[in-house]
């Protein structure tokens, strides 16, 4: 069984970019691998699209040989180089790999899969299963103070905001930092929780842009944050993940996990609250059909991302202007 403290610290600032580029460096000269093979080496096939993204932003192609990554059928595919696929073919042939009409001949002979890896995404799945077991649907008291969190991005930089509402008092905070984890469906907590933790101030309820138990392993960002910070939490998402729906109740594996309040607002409990309680709580915060603290947090993070962080602080008055 994974220890909660050890795993939390291991994954909190996990640099998946560096780990991934280390895998690419393992591909020997004279061999190729596929996007799917690299995703498997990371620990989950769902990471294949993220693999493509990380390859596309590789800033050191001479040291990190991304040209040795091809499509599943041996098609050479694209290459982020001024000369495009032509340069990729040239480099592959220089490695001794036969390429004819954009395809690698005898593909299986040149395919490399023997990565030395501890499959970090698989370990993260196990940790999420641990988090899910810690979720409680009861235990919350009165929500006097609400802290809403949102993260926006500009290239490989994140701008994370927190808005705390305590009655008529509003406080707003924004931080910025580099991103060390790409977007991979089901793993948002490992990308964004570290920002939430840095921003966190004691509050009765955490309102988070993301899912709670509406998650393949019942441990979305809101549940992850609620469990680790030991606070009641609710996730509010704009898009519905794979699930089934009966009227407005959302189910996963026959378990109620959320409520579709409207088309682009899906609410799920994160911690210390149940499905109906989370929906009722969010409805009480509606302003223009969206929970106001989270709307403001989104506006703050977005404005910082759009200006490259040149907006450095907000007064209560400017926060009201955004509202």
Swiss-Prot record:
This is Bifunctional methyltransferase/endonuclease. InterPro entries: Endonuclease-V, MethylDNA_cys_MeTrfase_DNA-bd, MethylDNA_cys_MeTrfase_DNAb, WH-like_DNA-bd_sf. Residues 92-323 are annotated as: Endonuclease V. One of its GO terms (cellular component) is cytoplasm. Its cofactor is Mg(2+). Its EC number is 2.1.1.-, 3.1.21.7. In the N-terminal section; belongs to the MGMT family. In the C-terminal section; belongs to the endonuclease V family. Its main location: cytoplasm. GO terms for molecular function: deoxyribonuclease V activity; metal ion binding; methyltransferase activity; RNA endonuclease activity, producing 5'-phosphomonoesters; single-stranded RNA binding. It comes from the Archaea. DNA repair enzyme involved in the repair of deaminated bases. Selectively cleaves double-stranded DNA at the second phosphodiester bond 3' to a deoxyinosine leaving behind the intact lesion on the nicked DNA. Mg(2+) binds at residues 150, 209.
